[in-house]
Amino acid sequence: MRLAKNENKILFIAEVSSNHHRDLNRSFAFIDAAAQAGCHSVKFQLFKIEQLFSPEILERSEKHRKREEWELPNEFLPELAARCRKNNVEFSCTPFYLDAVEELEPYVD
């Protein structure tokens, strides 16, 4: 499914964000629930803490360093995209650093 084909319709996007807890099965559960609820797309976020914050901030702030736990592992991408296809929903993901665009390209429409 390509969302662009639905130009005149309301689209429902389930925002998982970083609530996956780096757990693939939890991510699958979000996708399955979103599909069952009738969502058109499931959206994640792809970021790397060292790309978001300066080394000085990360060195001084444990709170910021702990956000590394929120990162979506790149190895999840093909499996998340496949699970979305299986559920007939679109996989989408916000890239937060330039290289993320290339990393996501094979998996998004």
Question: What do the PLM-derived regions correspond to, one by one?
Answer:
Residues M1, S27-K43:
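Short amphipathic alpha-helices and their capping/turn segments at secondary-structure boundaries
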Residues M1-A14:
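N-terminal amphipathic alpha-helix/helix-capping segment at the start of soluble metabolic enzymes
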Residues F12-A14, V42-F44, F91-C93, D109:
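Hydrophobic faces of well-ordered beta-strands that scaffold small-molecule active sites
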Residues E15, A34, L104:
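Conserved, mostly hydrophobic/aromatic
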Residues S17-N19, Q45-I49, F96-L98:
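Active-site beta-loop-alpha junctions enriched in small/polar residues
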Residues L24-I31, A100-P106:
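Catalytic cores of alpha/beta
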Residues H40-L72:
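Glycine-rich, proline-tolerant flexible connector loops at the mouths of alpha/beta enzymes
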Residues R60-D109:
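Active-site beta->alpha loop and helix N-cap motifs at the rims of alpha/beta catalytic domains
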